[in-house]
Amino acid sequence: LFNARDQYLYYRTEDNLTSLGGFYLYTVLGPKLLEGVARPSLSDYDIAFVKTDYYGSLYQKTPYKEARADSLAIFQYTKTPRQYLVTKRQDGALKTYHTLYPLHLLDLGREMDIFVGGLSAVTTIQTNSPYKASLLVFGDKTALTFLPFLANQYSTVTLVDLFQLGSQEYESLSLLDYDQVLFAYSIETFMHYNTPSRANRLLTTLEE
């Protein structure tokens, strides 16, 4: 990210990476997880700005109102067409999308949830990819910025939010279903919310 620091990597009014920031994070993360996969290029994507006047949670919290609005961009993979099934589990309820970017949520005032439907206890992305590997991710909202890119290189990617995980969602998980496990947290979450011990307890139980 440092090498691309002059680009639009972070929102001005939201405490998260932009889609472009997520892409650059993926360019480093992807090759480490996936041997033999070609280095990603922006030319592999059709980029669309779906909202150009977004003011996020940081803007709402501060009395300073001179910040410029943010733009929300989606990256559609065009190198090889993909179909997606996104399944979200939360409080015993099940919701599905057939897209990585459910844009109808813009009309509901849930702008940041257009990225994989937002953060839920368990989010699973299934892709008709030629790659057969599966990935289990323990992460926070930062992971939502790069999952749309990683999803194209796996058959299944599951994101688990340890802080929303209930007993019903927990029962749907099995380490045996995945080839790799990734921990993807912002520094703030990792340092202030006792994430390692939560993850360790869950992994120990799942292995039993």
Residue ranges and their predicted role:
Residues L1-E208:
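Extracellular glycan-modifying ectodomains
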